[in-house]
Design a protein with these regions (language model features):
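A polyampholytic, Gly/Pro-enriched intrinsically disordered region
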Residues: 140-154
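Short hydrophobic targeting helices and cationic amphipathic motifs
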Residues: 5, 9-11, 19
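A broadly conserved amphipathic alpha-helix scaffold signal in soluble, globular proteins
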Residues: 110-113, 143-147, 183-190
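Long, charged alpha-helical interface segments
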Residues: 210-230
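Acidic, Mg2+-coordinating catalytic module of metal-dependent nucleases/exonucleases
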Residues: 154-215
Length: 230
């Protein structure tokens, strides 16, 4: 009906879905031990989150967590919003051997660390990289990077969906939206890294990422403004 090939297989608490050729694995509360072992074998992992708002403490919630290994797959996890206990997710986020690739990680890392009580290690932010090397453009959104480096047009209209619905209530289109936020990030990271090297701005980027952790701590402490501004 919608041009989708949809196959659902049950593996314990995991659902495998082939949606528009994207392999989607759905998990409730946490990823399985088997999935953790698979993800730990990766040198890099794309990450993203969906929330019920701007993550104002005691009001908004971390609704979904998405991962991708870069092989046109997506792991979509709905954390337990009562206690946010997800030890396997925490293990992969704190694994310094695995680079976590994301777009505007100032938002995602802040939410993950606040709700999961973890320390996300080894990150690559495609938005920061884009601003440092794509100076020929004023457009640094994910959809802009996907179009330029992957030749795909993303539909971002579902970004304001109710992500707090039950996992099995999310539509095929919503699942694909969540997947699109991670499945292209590896290719984008590779392209931007080459540009940073070419423009001799890799060290500047690395220093910016080093400061990003402090920027996130400032956000979490209520200092959302630019403290360096006059």
């Amino acid at each position: 009906k919608n041009g989708y090939l949809l196959i659902i297989l049950h593996f314990d608490n995991t659902l495998y879905i082939n949606l528009s050729m994207t392999k989607i694995y759905k998990f409730q509360d946490d990823i399985s031990t088997e999935a953790l072992k698979d993800l730990e074998k990766c040198s890099s992992l794309a990450i993203d989150t969906e929330g019920s708002g701007l993550q104002i403490p005691h009001r908004d919630k971390l609704s979904l967590i998405q991962f991708s290994t870069g092989n046109n797959d997506a792991y979509i996890i709905q954390p337990n919003r009562k206690n946010y206990k997800a030890p396997n997710i925490v293990k992969i986020l704190e694994n310094a051997k695995v680079t976590k690739i994301g777009h505007y990680l100032r938002y995602d890392v802040s939410g993950l660390e606040y709700f999961l009580k973890c320390n996300v290690k080894n990150i690559f932010d495609t938005k920061v990289a884009s601003k440092l090397c794509r100076t020929y453009s004023q457009n640094h959104g994910l959809k802009d990077l996907v179009l330029e480096f992957c030749g795909k047009k993303l539909d971002k209209r579902l970004g304001s969906s109710d992500w707090n619905k039950k996992l099995d209530e999310l539509t095929d289109a919503q699942l694909q939206y969540c997947s699109n936020d991670v499945i292209y990030l590896h290719k984008i990271r590779d392209a931007l890294h080459k540009m940073l090297v070419r423009e001799n701005r890799l060290e500047l980027y690395e220093n910016s990422i080093h400061f990003l952790k402090t920027r996130i701590k400032l956000d979490q402490s209520g200092f959302t403004e630019d403290i360096f501004q006059h």
